[in-house]
A protein has these predicted regions:
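PLD/PLD-like phosphodiesterase catalytic module centered on the HKD motif
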Residues: 1-30, 37-164
Length: 164
């Protein structure tokens, strides 16, 4: 399938929620997500949380990769609660802000189901332009990029915070 272009913040957020619902329906074992802060993702949206809850099960893993999670903790309290409850299937890592990300997508969501892969990429956050693709080659290249970046990251966004 050829990549389908999209434009607009609302369209990007709609496609994110639809891709999460698709991943749940397809029984995807892994979901990979990249964004500098995830602040513009509809993580506390009821439909997104329902899709994630439906998806989260034995043997499932959500890999989050960001530069920081402070914005998520401040703006997406419902997702933070979900993260706490489903910590067993979430791995969150952070890359150093100084790390060069030349050519990196602004946002990336990857999943593979029985019907094949889905790759959702946002290239321009200013104009909210991106593409969604079912191309296996695009997914492989994006996953290799994600894995290379994850190797230069550290654990972050713990499911619970311990206080004194």
């Amino acid at each position: 399938m050829n990549a389908q272009k999209f434009e607009g913040r609302a369209e990007f957020q709609r496609l994110l929620v639809e891709t999460l619902a698709w991943a749940a329906a397809q029984g995807c074992r892994e979901i990979h997500a990249w964004d500098a802060s995830f602040v513009d993702w509809p993580l506390s949206d009821a439909n997104a949380l329902t899709a994630l809850t439906t998806w989260a099960g034995h043997g499932r893993q959500l890999y989050l990769l960001a530069q920081q999670y402070e914005d998520v903790q401040r703006r997406h309290t419902r997702f933070v609660r979900w993260r706490r409850d489903f910590g067993h299937c979430v791995t969150a890592r952070a890359v150093e802000p100084e790390l060069k990300l030349d050519g990196a997508p602004e946002s990336l969501l990857l999943a593979v189901g029985a019907d094949g892969p889905v790759v959702l990429r946002l290239f321009d956050r200013h104009l909210w332009r991106g593409e969604i693709s079912r191309d296996a080659g695009a997914r492989l290249r994006a996953l290799e990029w994600f894995d290379a970046l994850a190797q230069r990251s550290s654990e972050s966004f713990a499911p619970t915070t311990l206080g004194l």
